[in-house]
C-alpha cells in the first residue's frame, strides 16, 4: 500500500512537471503573436466587421469540434510539445476581437487528442501566464514620468484582486466545461454575433 502510494505521488509529480513544460512551450507562440499582432488587433477592434467575423469563427470552431466528438485519452504524459505549440498559436490568435480564448484553446486541445478533463484544465491554466505577461507589457508602455507610485500600486493591487478572483472561479469553470456540450457555447457566440450586427445597423 505504501509502495503504491509512493508510485502514485511520483506519477503526480511527473504529470505536474510535464504540464508545466507544456505550458511554457505554449507561451512561445502566444507571446510572439501577442507582441507582433497587438497593433493590428487594436485596429481590428475599431472595425465594425472584424469582431463579427471573430464571433462567427469561434462559433464554427466550437460547433465543428462538438459535432466531430473530438477529444481523446491523452493526459499530460501522452501530450506532445507540438500540440502545445498549436494550442499556443490558438491562444495568440485570440488577441483579435470576437475570438474566444477559452473556446479556441479548448477546441484545439480536444482536436489534439487531449481528454476532456485535461483539455479544460490546460486551457484554463494557459490563461494565467498570458494575463501576467500582458500586464507587464502594459506596464512597460508607460514612461518613467507617467508611472507614479500611486498608479503602480493600483496596477499591482488590481492584479492581486484579479488573481484571487480567478482562483475562485477556476474550479467552477473546470467543473462546468467538463460536462457541458460545446454547441451551447457556440450558440452564445452566435448570440454575440447577432447583437454585434444589431449595433452595427
Which functions belong to the PLM regions below?
Residues 167-190:
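Interfacial loop-to-transmembrane junctions
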Residues 90, 103-126:
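Interfacial segments of multi-pass membrane proteins
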Residues 116-141, 153-165:
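A small-residue-rich subset of transmembrane alpha-helices
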Residues 88-97, 130:
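Transmembrane alpha-helix interface/packing and boundary motifs in multi-pass membrane proteins
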Residues 9-10, 14-69, 135-139, 169:
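Membrane helix-loop-helix hairpins that form the core translocation module of multi-pass transporters
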Residues 1-8, 13, 192, 199-201:
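Single conserved hydrophobic/aromatic residue that forms the stacking wall/gate
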Residues 76-92:
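Small-residue-enriched transmembrane helix starts and helix-helix packing motifs
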Residues 46-50, 142-156:
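Juxtamembrane helix-entry segments on the extracytoplasmic side of multipass membrane proteins
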Amino acid at each position: 500500500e505504501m509502495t503504491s502510494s509512493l508510485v502514485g505521488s511520483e506519477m503526480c509529480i511527473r504529470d505536474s512537471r510535464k504540464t508545466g513544460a507544456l505550458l511554457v512551450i505554449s507561451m512561445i507562440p502566444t507571446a510572439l503573436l501577442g507582441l507582433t499582432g497587438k497593433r493590428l488587433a487594436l485596429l481590428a477592434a475599431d472595425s465594425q466587421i472584424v469582431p463579427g467575423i471573430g464571433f462567427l469563427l469561434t462559433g464554427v470552431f466550437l460547433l465543428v469540434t462538438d459535432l466531430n466528438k473530438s477529444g481523446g485519452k491523452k493526459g499530460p504524459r501522452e501530450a506532445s510539445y507540438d500540440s502545445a505549440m498549436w494550442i499556443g498559436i490558438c491562444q495568440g490568435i485570440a488577441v483579435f476581437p470576437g475570438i474566444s480564448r477559452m473556446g479556441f484553446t479548448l477546441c484545439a486541445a480536444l482536436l489534439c487528442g487531449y481528454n476532456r478533463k485535461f483539455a479544460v484544465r490546460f486551457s484554463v491554466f494557459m490563461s494565467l501566464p498570458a494575463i501576467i505577461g500582458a500586464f507587464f507589457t502594459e506596464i512597460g508602455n508607460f514612461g518613467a514620468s507617467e508611472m507614479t507610485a500611486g498608479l503602480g500600486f493600483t496596477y499591482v493591487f488590481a492584479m492581486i484582486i484579479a488573481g484571487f478572483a480567478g482562483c475562485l472561479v477556476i474550479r467552477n469553470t473546470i467543473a462546468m466545461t467538463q460536462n457541458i456540450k460545446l454547441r451551447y457555447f457556440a450558440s452564445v457566440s452566435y448570440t454575440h454575433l447577432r447583437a454585434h450586427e444589431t449595433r452595427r445597423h
